[in-house]
Amino acid sequence: MIDPKLKRALGQAAKGVEIVAATHDGVTRGYTSHWVSQVAFEEPIVMASVSPKHDTYPLMIASGAFTVSFLAGDQIDIGQYFSYPAHRFHYIAPEYLTEVNGHPVVPDSLSWIHCEIFETKELGDHVLLFARVTDFGYGRLKESPLIYSSRHGWRVANDKARTPGESPRDALLARVAAAGFDTSAAGSDEED
């Protein structure tokens, strides 16, 4: 178990927010990530870190590929929709993922890349997936990206930190509850 003080120290880094998704045998899953990095330039290679316990991981391995959508600052609701602990609601709002060139992509994201996995490495409680970028697209490149840090939460560059109690995630959970689903296990945005 990680020391809470170390967790807080590591959480100070602001990171871009991405949705990592994979499709295999007609099933698509996705999750919010801050742990996707470009590791080579001349040959575009990225690394994604994922928990093998996540329901997207088996699809990534079985398909040998994944797609990363980079979120814009006005896509907080999408980032929170695919984030833990509301993971069991990921698949009741198909408007958040669409298919582009056969890849699961967040509509109107800043850009997206499709990656073919060529190497994996188990490291601690996660698996690092090294992949070549084989397809890409972009949309709103002039928009500010969505960023996240544990200190300030979901933000857009140069924005103030969100006000507690005004979470788009909580609004989404209210929408899910109104549709008749039990959201009691989803927790609160104010936890941690």
Predicted regions located by residue number:
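Basic, polyanion-binding surface patches
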Residues: M1-D192
